[in-house]
Amino acid sequence: MTDSALDRTLVARHLRFQTNGRYLTDDVSLELNCGEIVAIIGPNGAGKSTLLRLLTGYLTPDDGECLLAGQPFSHWQPSALAKTRAVMRQHSGMAFAFSVQDVVAMGRSPHGRYPKNDDVVQQVMAQTGCLELATRDYRHLSGGEQQRVQLARVLAQLWHPEPTPGWLFLDEPTSALDLYHQQHLLRLLKQLTREQPLAVCCVLHDLNLAALYADRILLLHEGKLVAQGSPADVLQAETLAHWYRADLSVGSHPDYAIPQVYLRQ
């Protein structure tokens, strides 16, 4: 891998993480490249959120290594890492009263006194449909509104005046969103990965959303990476029925050459 390619890649090798004698992540190796969306799927308890925490540096593996742009997380200065890697957790509550605009502006804190911070906040709020929420108390928003605000925050965190490699990690970002906002969020992420050197890695339970928007899919089961590849490679009826233990079928999307998953009654 060339130096320029290395600068745009996160590499995980043989990651293992255990607790109470049980491996939550077991010998997982993968790459996340700028310019793509990667979806992590799998049944409940598969280890999806644990893997995400290992890939972001919030957990240290018992074995294996994770290199962001060629460097282990321990070699990164916190301020530089915060401007390169952003994480949207599954639940992001606030104990105190902050306006939506204040929450989004928190994403700019690693950038110090950049003169256009306010402009960046307005831009990402517009992109995520949060402008009309700007003065609202974050604590009083619906779950879906809070998810949109948190997306704006992490986009603000990774915004740079010049194209700069970045990695965005999202844990179930569509779980509280209605259909319109699911589509809007994932279309926005797709657009950003095409326009910027940005890698997006997200945990998704909706397999059809993963098929529509992900460039690659990683299927986990009991901490192991049991399948990876394009949506067509991974979302096959036999594979999904085996690992999800569900009665299902897989067909084709009416408009695109991608699979769609259907549950049987």
UniProtKB/Swiss-Prot annotation:
Q: Which UniProt keywords apply?
A: ATP-binding, Cell inner membrane, Cell membrane, Membrane, Nucleotide-binding, Translocase, Transport
Root EC class:
translocase
Main localization of the protein?
membrane
Q: In the record, what terms sit under GO molecular function?
A: ATP binding; ATP hydrolysis activity
Instruction: Cite the PROSITE patterns for this sequence.
Output: ABC_TRANSPORTER_1, ABC_TRANSPORTER_2, HMUV
Gene3D superfamilies in the record, alphabetically? P-loop containing nucleotide triphosphate hydrolases
**Which InterPro entries does this chain map to?**
AAA+_ATPase, ABC_transporter-like_ATP-bd, ABC_transporter-like_CS, P-loop_NTPase
Cross-referenced SUPFAM superfamilies: P-loop containing nucleoside triphosphate hydrolases
Annotated compartments: Cell inner membrane
What membrane topology does the UniProt entry give? Peripheral membrane protein
PANTHER family in UniProt: HEMIN IMPORT ATP-BINDING PROTEIN HMUV
Which NCBIfam families does UniProt cross-reference here?
PRK13548.1
Q: Which family does it belong to?
A: Belongs to the ABC transporter superfamily. Heme (hemin) importer (TC 3.A.1.14.5) family.
What job does this protein perform? Answer: Part of the ABC transporter complex HmuTUV involved in hemin import. Responsible for energy coupling to the transport system.
Protein known as: Hemin import ATP-binding protein HmuV
Organism annotation = Pectobacterium atrosepticum (strain SCRI 1043 / ATCC BAA-672)
Gene name, please?
A: hmuV
